[in-house]
């Protein structure tokens, strides 16, 4: 099973959307194998978003991500990265389809509720930033036999 990193950003937590996000993940057949709520440290945020360090929005992004609690998850399942990005919708809420998390709940590209890894390499890097291997559970959902061939 493929794994991906997912974060409910501070705006999603503050708006009470954590349960909605988790529900959509699980209803789609993915499973949450690690979960934590915390205020992400500035150094961790800078490591996570390091590829954007030269961009003009980087300081405000770091300020936002560290402004309050977020929920970090490792999500697993068949094609978890692609499926999770489809659940989230386009990064810019204006372009996000109705029925996606961002299409239904996001208001602004800078406050777009959720983050999910965009590639296997990014997923591995982001998971390692936020979780130790010992914090990731290995279990089977009882409905996996119905979900996958």
UniProtKB/Swiss-Prot annotation:
- Lineage top rank: taxon: Archaea
Q: Kindly list the biological process annotations in GO that this record carries.
A: CTP biosynthetic process; GTP biosynthetic process; UTP biosynthetic process
Catalytic activity of the protein: a 2'-deoxyribonucleoside 5'-diphosphate + ATP = a 2'-deoxyribonucleoside 5'-triphosphate + ADP; a ribonucleoside 5'-diphosphate + ATP = a ribonucleoside 5'-triphosphate + ADP
Print the keywords alphabetically.
ATP-binding, Cytoplasm, Kinase, Magnesium, Metal-binding, Nucleotide metabolism, Nucleotide-binding, Phosphoprotein, Transferase
* EC number of the protein: 2.7.4.6
* Assigned GO CC terms: cytoplasm
Output the Pfam families linked to this UniProt entry.
Answer: NDK (PF00334)
Q: Does the keyword Nucleotide-binding apply?
A: yes
Localization terms from the record: Cytoplasm
One GO molecular-function entry: ATP binding
Instruction: Give cofactor(s), names only.
Output: Mg(2+)
Where in the sequence is the active site?
115 (pros-phosphohistidine intermediate)
Q: Name the InterPro entries on file.
A: NDK-like_dom, NDK-like_dom_sf, Nucleoside_diP_kinase, Nucleoside_diP_kinase_AS
Instruction: Indicate the enzyme's highest-level EC class.
Output: transferase
Q: Where does ATP bind?
A: 9, 57, 85, 91, 102, 112
**Matching Gene3D superfamilies:** Nucleoside diphosphate kinase-like domain
What's its job?
Major role in the synthesis of nucleoside triphosphates other than ATP. The ATP gamma phosphate is transferred to the NDP beta phosphate via a ping-pong mechanism, using a phosphorylated active-site intermediate.
Belongs to which family? Answer: Belongs to the NDK family.
Which PANTHER family does the record cross-reference, listed alphabetically?
NUCLEOSIDE DIPHOSPHATE KINASE
Name the UniProt record assigns to this protein: Nucleoside diphosphate kinase
| Source organism (scientific name) | Methanosarcina mazei (strain ATCC BAA-159 / DSM 3647 / Goe1 / Go1 / JCM 11833 / OCM 88) (Methanosarcina frisia)
What is the phylogenetic placement of the source species in the record? Archaea, Methanobacteriati, Methanobacteriota, Stenosarchaea group, Methanomicrobia
């Amino acid at each position: 099973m493929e794994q991906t990193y997912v974060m409910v950003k501070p705006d999603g937590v503050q708006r009470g959307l954590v349960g909605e996000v988790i529900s959509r993940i699980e209803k789609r057949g993915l499973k949450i194998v690690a979960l934590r709520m915390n205020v992400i440290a500035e150094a961790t945020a800078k490591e996570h978003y390091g590829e954007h360090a030269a961009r003009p929005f980087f300081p405000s992004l770091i300020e936002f991500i560290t402004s309050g609690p977020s929920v970090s998850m490792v999500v697993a399942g068949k094609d978890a990265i692609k499926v999770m990005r489809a659940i989230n919708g386009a990064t810019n809420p204006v372009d996000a389809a109705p029925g996606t998390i961002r299409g239904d709940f996001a208001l602004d590209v800078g406050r777009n509720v959720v983050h999910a890894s965009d590639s296997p390499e990014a997923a591995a890097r982001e998971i390692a930033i936020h979780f130790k291997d010992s914090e990731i559970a290995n279990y089977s959902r009882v409905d996996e036999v119905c979900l996958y061939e």
